[in-house]
């Protein structure tokens, strides 16, 4: 993991390779490298730790050029981030880049070492280059070499390969990890991400599981796992990728936080009528499908999972539909019981999250009524696998820590909950639509808390632990607040249902522990106040975000952050904003890498 790009052309492709990698940088990575065929028809390789700009400098120094090459940005899974573990991995006449995990790499490595192979890295990926070289000694036919290699590999992979006996070809293969082939005039491209292809060509083929292809500048040969040729019509992307800038903001995360109001305004314009949701916003004939749903099953990871937990509260409150939410990495390995007329909903910003993709494939083999995806990237793997799709149109989210995608998911899920409620309460739809339409004005007021968050962040700078508490739909917002703080400031943070405080977390509370309570003015206010009183009794530092008017004693050290009044259903979208700002400014004070925090990747394409 994390990004693959390749090009074969009648012209020099070195700059194309660097440009392709630069468009994959947003996914997160710790090293980069490329291989190409030189004029002598031999494979030449350069690698570096750090950023693509360092690889670009290295390419200029070495004057590397060629018409056929592959490139990779790596996010470490097997082996520490260093030069020897960077891709491409070369052995014999082969050069390989790999996304995914070779699950039986240790076993394969032992077998190959016994055959006198010497390994130069700690990665699972290098095994592929050795297997290819091993089978090339036994088979003259390239397809036989490839098929025997693929049979030995257990796990997920997207592979791009150069072979010195075929110096005008890129070899690609896929199983459980996305890989696309872009088709152009006198050139063909490969990428793990449509965003790196969209400025090169609009025509592409998506490599399916257990397929491989041989690509030169003028042709693409596609094969199945048996080595039989297959034919598939190309797809066409409508994406026009523009260079994304910070527009004067210090970080992409800051920019993306402040874009949320405009995104919601677009939803109001494009998805809502005067009093009702526009027809079929979840795909053609989706309104008919939703009328038959009796259960909803959400599957997602990370921030998207937190969004699904909010949706569970909404759906069960506004309809008679039972709802469950599961972490994708757990769902894909367990035995499931699917009630009749259950809607499976997958949520992913990138549309390429490995565990979520595998969960959809599992769902497609189960007894679900339909599969719906909520995603930000058109033509992603998740949208292609789904029966219905809701595209968030939030624009590229570059920062690893998700902000605008989270609120876009919440809006989509609130619209889903409302659509499911139509049969039980016709007036409720109008009420929720009215609340959504107040959001732009309320968020304008919420962003005025930025200075408060700057002050509060200084108080958090030297803390080691933080608790976030909430009840009802505010509980998942507490989870999301904790996730944001730990992601970018590296402060240990936990989100809890406030009622669970005395069942364990209270043992952690002392005078150095900030405890943040999220308390919209609703029927749970008194319960949250009771929980926070327990914190104050242990000298904990209490911060309450609320729109309820509260009177405090002069000696009370509780910090009240006044929130703008808002409707019940939109409260999660309002209360998450100061949590994002708080995390951002704590990270500013700690001088961390905000847009690309350590050890994290934007698009998690391995399990």
PLM features: residue spans?
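Glycine-rich phosphate-binding loops that contact phosphosugars or nucleotide phosphates
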Residues: 291-438, 471, 518-564, 582, ...
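Acidic/histidine-rich
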Residues: 153-187, 461-487, 522, 529
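Structural motif
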Residues: 68, 94, 295-297, 343, ...
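Glycine-rich oxoanion-binding loops at beta->alpha junctions
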Residues: 67-84, 274-287, 311-347, 353, ...
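Active-site phosphate/pyrophosphate-binding segments
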Residues: 260-264, 268-297, 388-514, 590-607
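Generic C-terminus detector
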Residues: 227, 541, 554-556, 566-607
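Conserved short alpha-helical segments that host acidic/polar catalytic motifs at enzyme active sites
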Residues: 1-246, 250, 262-269, 273-294, ...
């Amino acid at each position: 993991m994390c990004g693959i790009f390749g090009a074969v052309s009648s012209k020099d492709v070195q700059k194309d390779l660097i440009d392709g990698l630069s468009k994959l940088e947003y996914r997160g990575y710790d090293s980069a490298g490329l291989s190409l065929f030189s004029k002598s028809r031999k494979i030449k390789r350069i690698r570096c730790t750090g950023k693509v700009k360092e690889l670009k400098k290295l390419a200029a120094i070495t004057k590397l050029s060629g018409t056929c090459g592959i490139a990779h940005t790596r996010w470490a899974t097997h082996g520490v981030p260093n030069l020897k573990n960077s891709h491409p991995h070369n052995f014999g006449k082969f050069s390989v880049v790999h996304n995914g995990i070779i699950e039986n790499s240790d076993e394969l490595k032992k077998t190959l070492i016994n055959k006198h192979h010497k390994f130069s890295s700690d990665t699972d990926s290098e095994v592929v280059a050795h297997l290819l070289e091993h089978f090339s000694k036994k088979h003259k036919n390239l397809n036989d070499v490839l098929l025997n290699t693929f049979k030995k590999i257990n796990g997920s992979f997207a592979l791009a390969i150069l072979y010195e006996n075929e110096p005008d070809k890129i070899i690609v293969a896929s199983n459980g990890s996305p890989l696309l082939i872009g088709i152009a005039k006198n050139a063909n491209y490969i990428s793990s991400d449509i965003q790196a292809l969209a400025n090169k060509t609009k025509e592409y083929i998506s490599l399916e599981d257990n397929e491989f292809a041989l690509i030169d500048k003028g042709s693409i040969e596609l094969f199945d796992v048996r080595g039989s040729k297959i034919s598939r019509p190309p797809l066409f992307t409508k994406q026009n990728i523009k260079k994304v800038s910070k527009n004067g903001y210090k970080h992409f995360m800051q920019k993306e936080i402040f874009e949320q109001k405009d995104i919601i305004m677009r939803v109001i314009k494009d998805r809502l009528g005067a009093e009702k949701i526009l027809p079929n916003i979840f795909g053609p004939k989706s309104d008919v499908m939703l009328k038959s749903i009796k259960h909803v099953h959400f599957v997602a990871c990370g921030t998207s999972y937190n969004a699904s937990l909010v949706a569970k509260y909404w759906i069960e409150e506004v309809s008679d539909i039972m709802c469950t939410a599961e972490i994708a990495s757990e769902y894909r390995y367990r035995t499931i019981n699917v009630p009749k007329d259950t809607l499976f909903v997958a949520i992913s910003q990138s549309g390429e999250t490995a565990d979520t993709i595998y969960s959809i494939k599992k769902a497609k083999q189960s007894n679900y009524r339909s599969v719906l995806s909520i995603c930000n990237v058109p033509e992603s793997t998740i949208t292609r696998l789904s029966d219905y799709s809701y595209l968030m149109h939030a624009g590229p989210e570059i920062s690893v820590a998700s902000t605008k995608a989270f609120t876009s998911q919440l809006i989509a899920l609130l619209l889903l909950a409302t659509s499911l409620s139509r049969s039980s309460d016709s007036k409720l739809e109008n009420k929720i639509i009215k609340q959504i339409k107040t959001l732009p004005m309320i968020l304008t007021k919420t962003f005025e808390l930025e200075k408060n968050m700057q002050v509060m962040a200084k108080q958090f700078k030297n803390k080691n632990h933080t608790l976030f508490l909430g009840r009802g739909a505010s509980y998942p917002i507490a989870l999301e607040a904790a996730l944001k703080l730990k992601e970018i400031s590296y402060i240990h943070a936990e989100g809890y249902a406030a009622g669970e405080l005395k069942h364990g977390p209270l043992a952690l509370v002392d005078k150095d522990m900030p405890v943040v309570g999220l308390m919209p003015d609703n029927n749970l206010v008194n319960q949250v106040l009771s929980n926070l009183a327990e914190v104050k009794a242990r000298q904990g530092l209490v911060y309450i975000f609320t729109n309820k008017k509260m009177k405090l004693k002069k000696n009370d050290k509780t910090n009240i952050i006044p929130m703008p009044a808002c409707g019940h259903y939109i409260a999660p979208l309002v209360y998450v904003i100061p949590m994002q700002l708080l995390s951002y400014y704590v990270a500013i004070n700690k001088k961390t890498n905000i847009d690309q925090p350590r050890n994290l990747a934007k698009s998690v394409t391995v399990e």
